[in-house]
Amino acid sequence: MTTSTLQAPTRGWFDVLDDWLKRDRFVFVGWSGLLLFPTAYLAIGGWLTGTTFVTSWYTHGLASSYLEGANFLTAAVSTPADAMGHSLLLLWGPESQGDFIRWCQLGGLWAFVALHGAFALIGFMLRQFEISRLVGIRPYNAIAFSGPIAVFVSVFLIYPLGQSSWFFAPSFGVAAIFRFLLFLQGFHNWTLNPFHMMGVAGILGGALLSAIHGVTVENTLYEDGEQANTFKAFDTTQEEETYSMVTANRFWSQIFGIAFSNKRWLHFFMLFVPVMGLWTSSIGIIGLALNLRAYDFVSQEVRAAEDPEFETFYTKNILLNEGLRAWMAPVDQPHENFVFPEEVLPRGNAL
């Protein structure tokens, strides 16, 4: 008589780590968490440190921290000095040579926040891929999140890479972002760029679709309970629909003459519109990085220059852009020591 014993296969360290990372817990970690959590922690921590303590006097000639008297709307982690070019500004690099205070003064925190922030966003998208696979659903959440990632990377990384230095990227702050928007308008005529137009249409169109969808569902909820409001009548385990798609279709058919009759197509459209808006605006920013022009109506500018009585909204905007450049550049780029004589400052028919 012979007996045999089956030994359990030995599990390597990778399998043990894989099980631990994917364990069911309140906050899922996963393999993506190894990228997401450290980089997000460092990016947010760097931003809080910069807005609290670090001045922008040496890079922009500005006060930008709570310590100097700025508030939540005016504080920022400012871009590095123009002289730094596209240096990664590593703490141990030749610019700072391990001196933390000097590193902060040169704008090293901005490079730190931008780099770790980009990897944190990528980690968050990978997190959505990972959880989608584990739960057994399609990865459209992650695909949609590529929109914000495209905007962040194009605005904060690709645009300044196309310009002379990181200095021309947006600083991380509310008022600082507004300054960057004015800069894009004055130097690139951004609002007339077709990719900006598509971006606006996508974002506002997505908001409109979301509002229409929300009110339509609320309007067509089944009266299926005796409670004071319809929310309490909902049961997460109910098998039947909670609203009437047929009634919604009938309503919008009467309003517009057309309506969605397919829920899957409807929700894909709600996904597609805002994400395409983010993607197209990102493409436009890449164009600005290369200083590409869009919609220069030179014939109107020439006629306006020759005829004092001829002016269009376009020519008026061109004059406003000239004003932005002329009055903004000396303050925005103090290191250039710009001095514009009075006779070159823009004057239009209405200015």
UniProtKB/Swiss-Prot annotation:
The protein's enzyme class: oxidoreductase
Disulfide topology: none
Cofactor note text: The D1/D2 heterodimer binds P680, chlorophylls that are the primary electron donor of PSII, and subsequent electron acceptors. It shares a non-heme iron and each subunit binds pheophytin, quinone, additional chlorophylls, carotenoids and lipids. There is also a Cl(-1) ion associated with D1 and D2, which is required for oxygen evolution. The PSII complex binds additional chlorophylls, carotenoids and specific lipids.
Residues holding Fe cation: 213, 267
Superkingdom field: Viruses
Keywords assigned by UniProt, alphabetized: Chlorophyll, Chromophore, Electron transport, Host membrane, Host thylakoid, Iron, Magnesium, Membrane, Metal-binding, Oxidoreductase, Photosynthesis, Photosystem II, Transmembrane, Transmembrane helix, Transport
Residues that bind a plastoquinone: 213, 260
Membrane topology designation: Multi-pass membrane protein
One Gene Ontology term, aspect cellular component: host thylakoid membrane
Taxonomy of the source species: Viruses, Duplodnaviria, Heunggongvirae, Uroviricota, Caudoviricetes
Molecular-function annotations in GO: chlorophyll binding; electron transporter, transferring electrons within the cyclic electron transport pathway of photosynthesis activity; metal ion binding; oxidoreductase activity
InterPro entries, per the entry: D1/D2, Photo_II_D1/D2_sf, Photo_RC_L/M, PSII_PsbD/D2
Chain segments annotated as transmembrane: 39-59, 123-139, 151-164, 206-226, 277-293
Catalytic activity: 2 a plastoquinone + 4 hnu + 2 H2O = 2 a plastoquinol + O2
Record's protein name: Photosystem II D2 protein
Protein's UniProt keywords contain Cytoplasm: no
Family note: Belongs to the reaction center PufL/M/PsbA/D family.
Subcellular location: Host cellular thylakoid membrane
One Pfam assignment: Photo_RC
Organism the protein comes from: Synechococcus phage syn9
UniProt keyword annotation of Repressor present: no
NCBIfam families linked: psbD (TIGR01152)
Subunit field text: PSII is composed of 1 copy each of membrane proteins PsbA, PsbB, PsbC, PsbD, PsbE, PsbF, PsbH, PsbI, PsbJ, PsbK, PsbL, PsbM, PsbT, PsbX, PsbY, PsbZ, Psb30/Ycf12, peripheral proteins PsbO, CyanoQ (PsbQ), PsbU, PsbV and a large number of cofactors. It forms dimeric complexes.
Sites where the protein binds chlorophyll a PD2: 196
GO biological process, one term: photosynthetic electron transport in photosystem II
